[in-house]
């Protein structure tokens, strides 16, 4: 009868879930699921200096996330840039119960070795000094917190002080929900910061990467 069919379907789903590798197993494995529906692929065929985190299949060419420090190494050249310190903001301004937000921040910082989702750099490319910032989607999806917004404003200030172009690599979502309207205000301030760069007749280049969502494209990007 129909009840037996539902129970059987549920059991099949449980068995399929058990067969899937855990996050820890996927992270430690040399193999990863293919982005274009083929058999599993070796990570080293995608994450290398030639492919630069892009699928080698000509019919796919899927772009995987690119951590900021790796991106800066590729753009400026290794040891040819410096990481700029950014303002620190007290965590969890809305005091979420059970420290749920603080725990998420702690896990993201351990995973990425970053204070927030945005990293700022100053370096040289072909003899030209350039300021840049990059968003790390591994840090709570690349969501923009108050501290992330302050980091972007710092990048704008550094560009103006040093009279350099400002380049942004946008990868992530919009404002972080754990800070509600406060993070929304921060994103508004980033627009003002970028406008100051433009008022100083300095080039501002935003590069959309995978994945980039509406909150970012509606503000500083």
Task: Label each residue range with its predicted role.
Residues 213-220:
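Short glycine/serine/threonine-rich phosphate/pyrophosphate-binding segments
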Residues 1-202, 211:
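Terminal-region recognition feature
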Residues 207-213:
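Glycine-rich beta-to-alpha transition loops that act as phosphate-gripper elements at the mouths
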């Amino acid at each position: 009868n129909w009840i037996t069919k539902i129970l059987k379907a549920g059991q099949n789903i449980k068995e399929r879930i058990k067969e899937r590798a855990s996050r820890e197993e996927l992270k430690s494995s040399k193999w990863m699921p293919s982005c274009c529906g083929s058999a599993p692929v070796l990570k080293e065929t995608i994450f290398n200096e030639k492919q630069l985190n892009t699928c080698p299949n000509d019919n796919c060419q899927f772009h995987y996330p690119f951590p900021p420090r790796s991106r800066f190494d590729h753009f400026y050249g290794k040891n040819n840039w410096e990481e700029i310190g950014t303002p620190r903001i007290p965590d969890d301004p809305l005091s979420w119960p059970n420290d749920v937000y603080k725990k998420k921040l702690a896990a993201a910082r351990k995973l990425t070795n970053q204070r927030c989702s945005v990293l700022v750099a100053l370096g040289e490319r072909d003899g030209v000094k350039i300021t840049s910032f990059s968003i790390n989607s591994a840090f709570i999806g690349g969501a923009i917190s108050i501290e992330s917004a302050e980091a972007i404003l710092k990048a704008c200030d550094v560009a103006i002080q040093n009279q350099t172009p400002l380049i942004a690599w946008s990868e992530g979502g919009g404002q972080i929900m754990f800070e509600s309207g406060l993070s929304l205000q921060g994103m508004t301030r980033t627009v003002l910061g970028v406008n100051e760069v433009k008022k100083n007749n300095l080039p501002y280049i935003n590069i959309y990467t995978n994945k980039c969502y509406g909150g970012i494209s509606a503000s500083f990007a």
